[in-house]
Every structure is written in C-alpha cells, then in structure tokens.
C-alpha cells in the first residue's frame, strides 16, 4: 500500500472533473436551447448554420420587399381604376356631344366644361394636381412617366442573393400621353391625346378633330390604361407567388438550420441526468479513495 500517490483518488478526481464538465455543457445547452453555442462545439456545423441564417434572413427581407412591391402596384392600379372611370365618363360625354342634331353651342360648351374638368383630374404630368401627378409611393411618382420603358425602372429585390430582381415599368398615364395610337408604330398620334378633346368643334362645318377621331382618342386611352392595369396585375400575381415561395423556402431552411443548431431537449436532459448522477457517484468514490491511505495507520499500530 502506498501513501505518497493515491492513484485511485487521482483517477476518481479526473472522472469527477470530466463529469462536472459534461454536466456544465449540458446545462449550457439546456439553458440556451442550442447544441452549438461556440465554434468548439461543432466548427463545421457552426459555419453551415451561420450561412443558413444569413440566407434565412435574406429570404425574410426579400418577402418584405415583395410585399412592398405589391403595395406600390396596388397604389398605381388603384389610381388607374379611377382614371378608367373618368375616361368612361368622357367617352359617354363625347357620344352625347356627337348628337349635334339636338345640341346647340351652349350645350356643347357645357359638355366640354365637364370634359375639361375630368381631363384635368387625370393630370397632364406637369406636376399639377391630377391623378397622374399626385399618385406616388414613398416619394416616387408612379404615373407621370418617370418609370416608363426606356426611361427608368422600378427594381424589386425579390430574392436573398444577387441577380434575383424584378424590374417593372409604368408608362405615363397623363392626359398628354393617353389617346389615339398609331396601329403601325404604336406611338401616340400627334394632336390626338385626351388633352386635345374639344367637343365644341362639332358645331363647326369642318372640325379639326371629328367625332370619329375624338371617339378614337378616348377608346385608345381606355385601351392604354387597360393594358397598363393588366401588366400591373400580372406583376402583382407574380409577386404573390414569389412571397409564397419565399415563405416555403424560409420554412424549409429554418427547419434544416434547426436540426444543425438546436438542441434536442429530451435527449440533452437525459444526458444531463446521467452526467449529474455520475458526478455524484464520483464524489462519493473520491471520498472512499481518499479514505484508503488511512488504512495504513492500522499497520503502524
């Protein structure tokens, strides 16, 4: 029997330290809910998890961006709904004015007065108080041609990574930009915009714009607004599907990241209980090991 080196006590102390360390790690994981709290816990898992977290947060922001894009489109489309309503009324008035057999100059003047007010409400894009001038989203004027094709684009970042964007154009929807369109070039016919409508000319023997021409102006304007609303509706539908896809991708990626980083509480609690029992047993055995050298005294009596 040796008393200078108590090997049994040293072995038991090492096991006690190991069990206490394991218990502390168990408690750390249980209190944080994570099985990776530092790089030393799982270096590769931490790197993968952090990359996934960046992607998840990017997907969440992309979804918010798409929602903001829908809000912008709804703002523009709502304004165009009113523009449509105005143009339908203008068409009705042009048809009424075309009944020159029962209209005199006073009647045509009254009709033109209402048309002029309606056209003014559409706005001429010059910044005055019309729908095309005051329709804006976060300071961006949407219907004055600022984002027409070939001018500028509204860019929506709808993905978590680069090159995942959606560019949108909104043509000018002002009274100077809406009207009769050349069937060949697709351009607005000069002098035949909604702003040029003047039904008082119907009283003249040779009006500069005949009834047929002025009706074509309104019909062309209605078609232009319809086309723009259709394009905006298509973009809105796309963004809604984008949001659904981003949500599904984020959900799946979150589940994958959780499997890497989150702790299994039941399993970890079992490990903690085991290590705690082993620690208590080690303490008891250490006391026994420390008692063994005392037995040497029995030999010295």
Listing of model-derived features with the role each one plays in the protein:
Residues 1-301:
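Primary detection of the long, small/polar-rich alpha-helical "axial" segments characteristic
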């Amino acid at each position: 029997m040796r008393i200078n080196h108590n090997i049994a006590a040293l072995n038991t102390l090492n096991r006690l330290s190991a069990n206490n360390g394991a218990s502390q790690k168990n408690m750390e994981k249980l209190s944080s809910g994570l099985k990776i709290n530092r790089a030393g816990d799982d270096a590769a898992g931490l790197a993968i998890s952090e990359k996934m977290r960046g992607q998840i947060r990017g997907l969440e922001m992309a979804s918010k961006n798409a929602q903001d894009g829908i809000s912008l489109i709804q703002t523009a489309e709502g304004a165009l709904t009113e523009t449509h309503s105005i143009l339908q009324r203008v068409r009705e008035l042009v048809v009424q004015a075309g009944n020159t057999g029962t209209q005199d100059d006073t009647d045509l003047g009254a009709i033109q007065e209402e048309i002029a007010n309606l056209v003014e409400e559409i706005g001429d894009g010059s910044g005055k108080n019309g729908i095309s001038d005051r329709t804006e989203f976060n300071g961006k004027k949407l219907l004055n041609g600022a984002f027409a094709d070939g001018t500028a684009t509204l860019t929506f970042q709808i993905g978590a990574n680069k090159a995942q964007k959606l560019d949108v154009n909104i043509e000018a929807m002002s009274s100077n930009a809406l009207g009769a369109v050349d069937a060949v070039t697709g351009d607005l016919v000069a002098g035949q915009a909604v702003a040029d409508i003047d039904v008082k000319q119907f009283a003249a023997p040779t009006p500069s714009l005949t009834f047929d021409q002025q009706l074509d102006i309104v019909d062309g304007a209605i078609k232009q607004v319809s086309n723009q609303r259709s394009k905006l509706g298509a973009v809105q539908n796309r963004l809604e599907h984008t949001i659904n896809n981003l949500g599904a991708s984020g959900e799946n990626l979150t589940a994958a990241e959780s499997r890497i980083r989150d702790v299994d509480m039941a399993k970890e609690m079992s490990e903690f209980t085991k290590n705690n029992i082993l620690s208590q047993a080690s303490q008891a055995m250490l006391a026994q090991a420390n008692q063994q050298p005392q037995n040497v005294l029995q030999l010295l009596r």
